[in-house]
Amino acid sequence: MFKTLSKSIGFLVAIIALVKGDTYTCSQMQSLAEGYFRGPTLTTMLCISYYESTYNTQAINPTSKAAGLFQILPEHCGELCKTCTTPSDLLNPTINTECAKSILNSQGFKAWTTYASGDCKNWNKCVAPSASTHAASTHGSTGPSTHGSTTHGSTTSTTYTSGASSGLFDFKANNGGGQDMVKYF
């Protein structure tokens, strides 16, 4: 009786969390992240968020106090992330994703230990919509096609086509220190 009651309560708590909107589905994460990331970078960021928070907007690391979907450290508020003024702002999914973009642009993927440890290698649980459409394609294509690369000084932009859509997915600029900074349009 107690085990059944305990399972029922656990199930009810899980349902309440979903109704409250604290845990996003893959589709909800895609919709949010598409406003900030594109193509393979979007897929990688979906993976990072999954491993960092399991898409739980209210996730807080008890040791580091990293918070939200991308487990952003509170010290980044106001520093790398101008839209975050207090650590509690990191529990706002939009602010957390904006901060993730700023951190990605300044530190790269390796800012997240889950990426550095290889957890996102061959990730396929929740991918960029264009990547999933492309993967389901039976037209024999093996990946995105490069349609041009332009270099101006230390700045290179590349246009890709994946499936039926095309566009500028990423723009890399060398910051002079040997690291590429990624910008998304």
Swiss-Prot record:
Highest taxon of source: Eukaryota
Keywords: Disulfide bond, Signal
Active site: E52
S-S bonds: C47-C126, C77-C84, C81-C99
Gene3D superfamilies reported in the protein's UniProt record: 1.10.530.10
Positions of the UniProt region annotated as Disordered: 137-158
Signal peptide: 1-21
GO molecular-function terms, A-Z: lysozyme activity
Transferase found in the keyword field: no
Family: Belongs to the glycosyl hydrolase 22 family.
PANTHER family: LYSOZYME C
Protein name per UniProt: Lysozyme C-like protein DDB_G0291137
Organism annotation: Dictyostelium discoideum
